[in-house]
Amino acid sequence: MAKPVNVNQSKWTVPVLLKECEIYCPSTCVAFGPILSDNDSKLIIAHGGHRGVNMKLKVFQQLEQLSESSLADMPTALVHFINDLSSIPSIAVAAGPSLLIYKNLKPFYKFTVPSSAINPTESEAWKAVVNKKINGDTLLTVLKRLEDDVAFSKLTPISQTYLRADKETQVVLVEHYGTKIANSATITCIAKLTKSTAEPLDILVIGTEHCEIFLIDSQAFTILETIKIGSVPVNICAYGTYDVDYRLFVQTRASLIFCMKRGEADYQPIVISQSMITSMVLVNKMIVYTTVENLIHFASFRGKKMNTVKCPSKIKMLEPFIYPLKQLAAVIAVFDKEIRMYNEHYLLDTVQYEKPLAWVKYGCYGREDSTLVVAFKDGSIAIQIFRRKANFDTKLDYNQVPQAHALKLQIPKKTKVFIDLTQREVQLGNRIHKVYQKNLFDVKYRLAASYLELTSSASATVSTTTVLPVEISVDIHGFGPTFRMTIHLLSSSKQNLYDMHLSIISDPELYDFDTPLIPVHLLASGQSYSFTTLLYCKDPEKAANCDVRALLVHAKRATPIVTAVIKMPFSEFPLD
């Protein structure tokens, strides 16, 4: 539970545990909202059970469980929405490729996402194995070839399972599911968007594994719009109204954030993160997202960073905190055994717990507008209420200047040498500037000449075999700290070479590679192949360089086929 703190300083009440409660689910499977005629907000949880067993839709009121319903498939997300003004709201549970609609805690409707087209070669292979025209090994070979040609994610779910299964499971898949092949898209995330201010109905927004986003009418359950993006969506945040103007902020598995507006057809990412994005929420008119580097970024709707918070440990998730009575908007960051409340400038509050946390959910529960539901890893759930008399007079700047940096510099007094140099610069300023420009041009010229000499004569190749004659050459482009390395391979062997890799090795303290291991699936005789990767100098201020080796290796050979040694040039400083 929460550690004892001073009652006058704590902004939350003492947490109270729910009775006989054991819940295991992600934060996306939790929602608040009224679902009965009493209009009291309930806690709705899609319980994932244990290994696909005992999956339930549970509803809690006060400190007890009110009801539960069984779920046929593993839930991935849940949302509470309004689809009829004359009746009570509904619940939508995303499970597999389907959207399960519950009204009055009873199954009401099932919406299934449209399936995508199946690869013709894949479909023919499954039909052939069902009709006993080919065996399971041939099917596995065909699917592996398709995996290399069209990517693993483009195959149907049954083919993906077949590729990763053992022999016994593959036989069962062919016997029971071979005739039911379908390319259904699993729902990854779900959100809701208000239709209009005059008519407070909701539009459902869902994302799928096929990189598609569907806007669904919650009354007729028809697809209003279909949006195709270049990566798999994992989180959607909606802003605005559908009939007037709306924005959809989509976090993808490739650590991109897209902004989708009404009337736009070409969607480009507004945030491109070099490290993996783990969570994203909207607070007022800001995008708040976290990365695996323990950073919280505050950005505008255009993607421009406004501030960054460096956190002391791993951030599990973010939860928006809105308190209209005090016009307070912040974000709750969940750590292992504590939660912290941040806005774009300050650290507002910290609450510590004795047990590891799983997730938190903030919203209206029962008659309380500001309730925090805290879930622990052991399955227990606690309820805390935000104090109405809580104040935020004490604020901590999370980017405080270190004490050593805050010291004033001791500027020396004006000496005779200082005065003489100042007068010289005033009198001969134009001449000094011309000499400086001449010397700078001379340095740039010598640098370019040295760089050209290095790039033309710094590559040395060593071949360790005469059976597999392969020529290798390496080009280095750029001044640093980012270089582009292009490796050229030319095979003069009579036979084609298969299943090789290019391994790039250097001092890890000096350089970092974008792709240190490049697969080389085929080297045809007499054909030239080029492979490109990026090389980053970690610390250009050291003015150090070392040799970089490019090795062409094969899994069945103990020594490299051919090796290239590159003498790297010194890195320039970054422009920014």
Swiss-Prot record:
Organism: Caenorhabditis elegans
Name of this chain's protein: BBSome complex member BBS1
Location of the protein in the cell: Cell projection, Cilium; Cytoplasm, Cytoskeleton, Cilium basal body; Cytoplasm, Cytoskeleton, Cilium axoneme
Phylogenetic lineage: Eukaryota, Metazoa, Ecdysozoa, Nematoda, Chromadorea
Domain of life from the UniProt record: Eukaryota
Mutant phenotype after disruption: Mutants have normal body morphology, but with reduced body length and width, delayed larval development and decreased roaming movements. Defective cilia structure and function.
Effect of G207D: In ju598; impaired movement of intraflagellar transport proteins along the ciliary axoneme and accumulation of intraflagellar protein-B at the ciliary tip. Accumulation of all BBSome proteins around the ciliary base
Function: Component of the BBSome complex. The BBSome complex is thought to function as a coat complex required for sorting of specific membrane proteins to the primary cilia. The BBSome complex is required for ciliogenesis but is dispensable for centriolar satellite function. Required for proper BBSome complex assembly and its ciliary localization. Required for cilia biogenesis and both the assembly and movement of intraflagellar transport proteins along the ciliary axoneme.
PANTHER family for the chain: BARDET-BIEDL SYNDROME 1 PROTEIN
Gene name as annotated: bbs-1
